[in-house]
């Protein structure tokens, strides 16, 4: 009987050590997730500032588009795509952390069940309390990760909407630039025709 109890206690200690390792891994994942959340918030602020920046620089872009329209449009499109790509990478990383936490929680429940079965002959109340405490904490952490994932989805949706609006503005600027060039070409041709008519009239007057 003493051998059986000693074996049960040894198994319990081993399981508790594994639980501590899982807790440490979960805390590390939560820290990484918090860092991702801060980056997401920074990205959202940057995304919100984009429309104001484009409104302030709209007139400057219109003037500059007369000289270097293709270069400017290419630069703006590259910056927007880089922001969207970074947002998507953050979102994927966040989902990977969420999956890892859920896997840890599943293993944690399995080990706690094994511990409870092995300790039927021993008072299980402290183990139950520890299980309830750790389970509630890890589930709370998973809820936080889910909330962060939802924030990321909304941020990516906002970025996509802003990208479409900016694309429309850039297309409008290209059209205006083309029309201005056509007007300039027509004005130049008209001026040249008037100059030639004036020269012909002067030549006839001299004769």
UniProtKB/Swiss-Prot annotation:
One of its GO terms (molecular function) is protein-macromolecule adaptor activity. GO terms for biological process: negative regulation of hippo signaling. GO terms for cellular component: cytosol; FAR/SIN/STRIPAK complex. InterPro entries: SIKE. Changing residue 19 to D: Loss of interaction with SLMAP. The keyword Glycoprotein does not apply. Changing residue 36 to D: Loss of interaction with SLMAP. It holds the Pfam family SIKE. Its main location: cytoplasm. Changing residue 43 to E: No effect on interaction with SLMAP. It is found in: Cytoplasm. Signal peptide: none annotated. Keywords: Coiled coil, Cytoplasm. SUPFAM superfamilies: Spectrin repeat. Residues 70-102, 162-193 form a coiled coil. Widely expressed. Expressed in brain, heart, skeletal muscle, colon, thymus, spleen, kidney, liver, small intestine, placenta, lung and leukocytes. Present in all cell lines tested (at protein level). Belongs to the SIKE family. Interacts with IKBKE and TBK1 via its coiled coil region. Interaction with TBK1 is disrupted upon viral infection or TLR3 stimulation. Interacts with CDC42BPB. Interacts with SIKE1 which mediates association with the STRIPAK core complex composed of PP2A catalytic and scaffolding subunits, the striatins (PP2A regulatory subunits), the striatin-associated proteins MOB4, STRIP1 and STRIP2, PDCD10 and members of the STE20 kinases, such as STK24 and STK26. PANTHER family: SIKE FAMILY MEMBER, SUPPRESSOR OF IKBKE 1. Physiological suppressor of IKK-epsilon and TBK1 that plays an inhibitory role in virus- and TLR3-triggered IRF3. Inhibits TLR3-mediated activation of interferon-stimulated response elements (ISRE) and the IFN-beta promoter. May act by disrupting the interactions of IKBKE or TBK1 with TICAM1/TRIF, IRF3 and RIGI. Does not inhibit NF-kappa-B activation pathways. Associates with the striatin-interacting phosphatase and kinase (STRIPAK) core complex, forming the extended (SIKE1:SLMAP)STRIPAK complex. This is Suppressor of IKBKE 1. It comes from Homo sapiens.
